[in-house]
Amino acid sequence: GLLIAKEGGSIASKPHLASGITVGARMPSQMVAKHTSGVPVEFGNLIPSDGRYTIVIFAGNLSKPEQLSRVKHVSQVLELPEAFSQRLKQHAIDPQDVFQTLVLHTGSRDEVEITDLPSSLFLGSNPLGQVYVDNDQVRIWTLNEAYKGYGVDQERGCLVLVRPDRHVMYVGDLEDVDKLEKLVSSALV
């Protein structure tokens, strides 16, 4: 889908990165596991219609250092002074009131620690309830299907922006975080 930002620019989604997710449609749900406990949950239930946007970081295989580095780049862009989260803070608005971030990875829960992820990804929230895993380490009969269902590459991942009404607004590469940032900034701040 092509999105027109308020400032006149256009930002094109990359639907091929998540072939099971349709821009403009509701975010589908898949079974995943909570990273901290391994308890299975419906991913769609983590995206409530509560007035907040949700940034879903399909982080891919975080057991690989090069993939963790790609995810850290996302946080570096979100920490820039001109980033939407920083601009919200300048207006005395808590970013958590407007956004939530969810991370879904395919790495091993034994090899990946939540503390490996930059805290800035979580916009000041507690990351313990925001990191989920899709692999077959917990219950093989219910897991390791979310990335397939979403049509996302299990190694590389992608970014998805979900509107407050649970409809998908944007799909891009992790390296496209600057485009996501521009889209959000032009729409909100």
Model-derived features: positions:
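Helical substrate-recognition/capping region of FAD-dependent monooxygenase/halogenase enzymes
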Residues: G1-V189
